[in-house]
Amino acid sequence: AQESAAPTGELPIDRTVVTPARSEDAAVTVRVSIGDGEVLTLPLDKYLWRVVAAEMPASFEPEALKAQTVAARTYTLAKMGRTVQNHPDADVCTDINCCQAYIEPDQAAENWGENTQVYTAKISAAVADTDGVAALYDGAPIQAVFFSSAAGRTVDAVEVWGNAVPYLSGVDSPEGEEVPNYHSTASVPVEEFKRTLLAKVPQADLSGPPSGWFGETVRNSAGGVSSVTVGGAAVTGSALRELFSLRSANFTVTADESAVTFSVTGYGHGVGMSQYGANALARQGKT
């Protein structure tokens, strides 16, 4: 979720058109681009239901679903009133590389099967119970970024995107082995690794044996890779994550004559709210 969102020091919000945080969702209209030039107009509460159903497992604890709803509402309010090149005629779109995930109720029901009635009610309750609630900083909606799971701690925004954002600092996150695919492995054939890396980092020297390609690793406060020396060149963990489709930048790496293997923990950019962390906190009774 929101993998491409990169906060800047000055939040890009038109403060003259932000909807008051305590408005009733049903009174707010959202224009949603669903592709092929089609734009739907939905009340905010109906839109939020579709976002939360797509962004977080409905099996999660009610308080986690509420947290996701507040994040989704805040994110949406921050988008409203801004002109975005990808969807100039709409406030938001359904492309997860630009905005938030989105699913129609009938598709959600197909996914949920016999749990449809319970899950529909849970998400409806999360939206209703947080009606109008948004996270603000200096009176305006924050950039409410989130991701799937952390490796014990979230990451400061400055350590991932290079811009310090006061409310996006690292905190402990209690999820762990209960998270599906919490640990993952990506094995890249040596020739594919060389071709892919050199296209991005042409100054890297990969002429020697693969076992000697990797040097010093610098890690951030959450244990993720800030940078690693590859063939004598410093490469960011985020760049390696993108190049080789790793689930996160929290990884170790080994190499032999046949493959470069990444052992990865967690999923996502690591900044903001961890969804599985929120669920773990909810199970502890946190609200």
Describe the residue ranges of each PLM region.
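Conserved, single-site charged/polar hotspot
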Residues: A1-T287
